[in-house]
Amino acid sequence: MANQSRPKVKKSRALGIALTPKAVKYFEARPYPPGEHGRGRKQNSDYKVRLLEKQRLRAQYDVSERQLVRAYERAAKTQGKTGEALVIELERRLDALVLRSGIARTIYQARQMVVHGHIEVNGQKVDKPSFRVKPDDVVMVRERSRQKPLFEVAREGGFAPDGETPRYLQVNLRALAFRLDREPNRKEIPVICDEQLVVEYYAR
């Protein structure tokens, strides 16, 4: 599991993206990097710009460097734009789609739901957050877990994302279930990232 020892709000501010709902409030009050010199402007080298973008992508999916490299290697073998393929690879992770569906509030919570054995795919328990969901796969909360308070909140829409549910998902929160209808399109994926900079970072 990726190292999450650094406070998530501070990490969010350092990367310039809100990784949790709580971080959104901090952005409104403190729209600058953490630390007493956070308000000052800094000139970043091309390398640092690419590194930051890579870290932003990693953080939004809560993956390790090794996991991101593997996803990049798979994406590089596909036709089309490598950067878009990379984001799509990450979006097909089980924990990412549990988050998108509204069953979980954050990527961290989604990961824990999977690791603790609360999620099944096509009727089989899956406890690996990195499991790659395929089109037509049906994902749902296991029967034995549905009465837990956390999932009662999810069933009532308490964790539903702002705006529309991504069109590549068919979600039934009352049933705590969703289906991946098709492969996501990069433009539909709610991730803040200039993926071309990530490609340039790894291609250097």
UniProtKB/Swiss-Prot annotation:
The keyword tRNA-binding does not apply. Residues 92-157 form the S4 RNA-binding domain. One of its GO terms (cellular component) is small ribosomal subunit. CDD domains: S4. GO terms for biological process: ribosomal small subunit biogenesis; translation. One of its GO terms (molecular function) is rRNA binding. Keywords: Ribonucleoprotein, Ribosomal protein, RNA-binding, rRNA-binding. SMART domains: Ribosomal_S4, S4. It holds the Pfam family S4. It comes from the Bacteria. The keyword rRNA-binding applies. PANTHER family: 30S 40S RIBOSOMAL PROTEIN, SMALL RIBOSOMAL SUBUNIT PROTEIN US4M. Belongs to the universal ribosomal protein uS4 family. Part of the 30S ribosomal subunit. Contacts protein S5. The interaction surface between S4 and S5 is involved in control of translational fidelity. One of the primary rRNA binding proteins, it binds directly to 16S rRNA where it nucleates assembly of the body of the 30S subunit. This is Small ribosomal subunit protein uS4. It comes from Streptomyces avermitilis (strain ATCC 31267 / DSM 46492 / JCM 5070 / NBRC 14893 / NCIMB 12804 / NRRL 8165 / MA-4680). The gene is rpsD.
